[in-house]
């Protein structure tokens, strides 16, 4: 088995074991024990061992989940770190209790970052237990080793990371007991009961565990080796990640496209006709556009073509995690991580189904109960008042497009829940998920589209309009947006206006003509919405809906990747109008400049992610994947050379504020003041100098710029220690060749009161 090659992980983990029979009837055993006479206790010792109470141990990922499971199982007795009752022990992991050990664990010399130590490629992987979670690990280890525990149920999150969390603890505890897997998509009591009635053999998920383990090891190898390599070569800490760096490359590339973009002006002639307007083609020659406008002004336009089509717009599919994060960012302004956190809370509160899903459909066994759920959700949502609700279950049922988990939907518990008591963020996400369910099963949006072509002065002009036949799902969407204080308009609203009845050959008077000037626009800065979309397709602009997706990261990991890019200083969130843009820092651009293709290529990294999926499906051996990662790193360390001219690339450019009064060199702002950049010159204006501190003022760039240019600067809000009041005055620079001194001039500019 593959598991036998995992160093400290026992190969017995991967041995498939037969399921156990259900536990004996507890009351019957208690009654049988009660008829034994006291004198027979010693004689019955052997029999007692055989009839000892047996338990099944359930290990969840979080205490809150364990509590919900225990309530359904009847494990009501609280113990230290677990719950007990009805033949069950229920405990929890507190997330990642253990993880891959750091480099220094393998060799103390690795504590210091040195080029000669690279690449660091462990032969036998080691794991360490988080210090702040040691107590809970000890509880789990004791439970896993108890003789009365006959079977272990893995109830950690039903996904790649949940599998890794459980298996790591199981193996570190030295456990070899049979594993059963709880795999559910909802925390509703009914879903929990059904899940425990259909526990699966743990061996069914060996591939999932191997994929999770390979992902963790690959991230460790790339992070440790590439980060150390580039940090040592470029003399500053540069965090590099297997998925993080290609994601950053997408953003840097977009910024380069924006910077290189040169807008091209264009001109469009617009004619006002009775009841509507038409537009001509874009023209690059302004004079020609003016000439056409003059020719059309006061003239007649002839209708050349009228084309009417009945069209239908299908409802949007249900949410997977990524599409929900995108909409929540665009409509609500939430980051991907905020949306995931809110959705996780709703899942644990039994109000939404499993969050980390990549499917947008439901399974056929859910079809029968769907109309009831839709009605419950509709009644709980205030924005749908007055709108008829229907349920086309067939539109959202697609068994082949559901793998581990179905789409995110509300649960029936929404009926009893007090939604007003939910935190604002959770309520907003629940409403968005509810809206999508109601829209997805609603009728299509039907409309008649009219396209008209008119001729005037030998040029063609066009217009489009539409008449709504059935608002369908768009009525719900419009009602939801109307309930929000501010929300983007629906797509297509610009063409919702109907055109008047027109006939080919009809002549229309031109009431007015105008030339509208525009410019071609650059690509847009990434937002979390558009970046998540790019990560799904590894930067490809288009991808067929049915294509095998090879994206950057997974729905479960993308939010964390974005947050790390921000926390490490590579990305900045900058608000622009109603959107928050993601902009790369100076260091981000510098890093992508020096990174080789194999570390920044989105397509190559997406291929790695695809191979992890192959490991999960049993189509690729884990060691083949890992050997590819190791070979890449060996080549990288052995062949990479510092790019000439980039030695100082990671020193942020200093903004020059003026010329030095002593040597004529450049004076630039730094953290503690303004300094001459000529190393032989000592001119400095310190931000925290005693003179400025007494005035309770700090020299700004504007003040220093004026002092260097004119020798004086008008400063407001200076503090008087004598009167305790503030005043305005002119500060004069008085440099004696050793120190930059200052004095006040109250006579140069009137009006500043002392």
Where are these regions (language model features)?
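Conserved short loop/turn motifs at secondary-structure junctions
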Residues: 54-57, 155-158, 235-237, 308-317, ...
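C-terminal or mid-to-C-terminal helical accessory/interaction module adjacent to the motor/catalytic core
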Residues: 189-273, 308-312
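Amphipathic alpha-helical transducer elements in NTP-driven molecular machines
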Residues: 63-70, 87-94, 130-141, 146, ...
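Metal- or metallocofactor-binding catalytic centers and their adjacent structured scaffolds
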Residues: 286-319, 325
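N-terminal amphipathic/hydrophobic targeting modules at extreme N-termini
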Residues: 2-12, 17-19, 25-29, 33, ...
């Amino acid at each position: 088995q593959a598991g036998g090659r995992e160093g400290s992980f026992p190969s017995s983990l991967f041995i498939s074991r037969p399921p156990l029979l259900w536990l004996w009837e507890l009351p019957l055993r208690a009654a049988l024990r009660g008829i034994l006479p006291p004198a027979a206790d010693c004689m019955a010792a052997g029999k007692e061992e055989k009839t000892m109470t047996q338990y099944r141990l359930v290990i969840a990922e979080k205490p809150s989940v364990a509590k919900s499971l225990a309530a359904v199982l009847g494990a009501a007795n609280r113990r230290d770190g677990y719950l007990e009752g009805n033949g069950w022990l229920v405990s929890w992991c507190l997330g990642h209790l253990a993880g891959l050990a750091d480099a220094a664990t393998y060799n103390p010399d690795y504590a210091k970052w040195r080029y000669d130590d690279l690449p660091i490629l462990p032969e036998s992987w080691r794991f360490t237990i988080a210090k702040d979670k040691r107590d809970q690990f000890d509880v789990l280890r004791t439970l896993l080793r108890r003789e009365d525990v006959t079977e272990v149920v893995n109830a950690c999150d039903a996904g790649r990371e949940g599998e890794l969390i459980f298996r790591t603890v199981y193996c570190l505890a030295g456990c070899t007991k049979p594993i059963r897997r709880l795999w559910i998509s909802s925390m509703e009591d009914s879903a929990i009961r059904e899940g425990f009635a259909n526990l699966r053999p743990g061996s069914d998920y060996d591939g999932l565990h191997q994929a999770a383990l390979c992902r963790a090891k690959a991230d460790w190898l790339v992070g440790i080796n590439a980060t150390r390599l580039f940090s040592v070569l470029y003399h500053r800490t540069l965090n590099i990640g297997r998925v993080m760096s290609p994601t950053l490359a997408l953003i840097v590339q977009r910024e380069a496209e924006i910077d290189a973009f040169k807008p091209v002006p264009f001109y469009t002639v617009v004619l006002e006709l009775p009841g509507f307007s038409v537009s001509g083609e874009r023209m690059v020659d302004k004079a020609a556009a003016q000439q056409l406008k003059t020719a059309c002004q006061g003239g007649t336009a002839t209708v050349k073509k009228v084309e009417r089509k009945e069209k239908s717009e299908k409802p949007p599919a249900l949410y997977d995690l990524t599409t929900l994060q995108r909409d929540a960012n665009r409509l609500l302004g939430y980051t991907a991580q905020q949306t995931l956190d809110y959705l996780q809370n709703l899942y644990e509160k039994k109000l939404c189904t499993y969050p980390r899903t990549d499917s947008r459909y439901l399974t056929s066994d859910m079809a029968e109960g769907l109309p009831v759920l839709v009605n419950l959700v509709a009644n709980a949502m205030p924005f749908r008042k007055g709108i008829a609700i229907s349920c086309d279950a067939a539109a959202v049922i697609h068994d082949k497009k559901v793998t581990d988990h179905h789409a995110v939907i509300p649960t029936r518990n929404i009926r009893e829940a007090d939604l007003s008591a939910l935190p604002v963020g959770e309520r907003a996400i629940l409403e968005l998920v509810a809206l999508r369910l109601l829209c997805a099963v609603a009728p299509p949006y039907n409309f008649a589209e009219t396209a008209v072509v008119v001729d005037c002065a030998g040029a063609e002009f066009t217009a489009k309009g539409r008449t709504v036949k059935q608002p369908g799902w768009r009525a719900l969407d419009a009602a939801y947006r109307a309930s929000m204080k501010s929300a983007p308009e629906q797509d297509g609203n610009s063409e919702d206006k109907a055109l008047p009845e027109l006939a080919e050959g009809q002549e229309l008077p031109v009431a007015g003509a105008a030339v509208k000037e525009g410019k071609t626009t650059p690509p847009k800065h990434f937002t979390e919405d558009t970046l998540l979309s790019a990560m799904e397709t590894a930067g490809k602009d288009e991808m067929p809906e049915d294509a095998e997706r090879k994206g950057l990261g997974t729905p479960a990991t993308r939010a964390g990747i974005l947050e790390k890019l921000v926390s490490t200083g590579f990305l900045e969130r900058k608000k622009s109008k109603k959107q928050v843009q993601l902009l790369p820092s100076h260091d981000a651009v510098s890093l992508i400049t020096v990174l080789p293709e194999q570390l920044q290529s989105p397509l190559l990294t997406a291929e790695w992610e695809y191979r992890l999926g192959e490991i999960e499906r049993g189509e690729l051996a884990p060691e083949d994947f890992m050997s590819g990662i190791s070979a890449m790193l060996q080549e990288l360390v052995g062949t990479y050379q510092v790019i000439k001219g980039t030695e100082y690339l990671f020193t942020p450019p200093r903004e020059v504020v003026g010329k030095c009064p002593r040597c004529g060199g450049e004076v630039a702002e730094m953290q503690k003041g303004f300094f001459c950049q000529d190393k032989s010159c000592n001119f400095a204006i310190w931000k925290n100098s005693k003179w400025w501190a007494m005035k309770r003022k700090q020299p700004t760039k504007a003040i220093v710029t004026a002092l260097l240019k004119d020798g004086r600067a008008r400063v407001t809000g200076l503090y008087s220690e004598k009167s305790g009041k503030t005043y305005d005055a002119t500060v004069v620079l008085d440099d004696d060749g050793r120190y930059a001194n200052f004095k006040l001039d109250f006579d140069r500019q009137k009006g500043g009161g002392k």
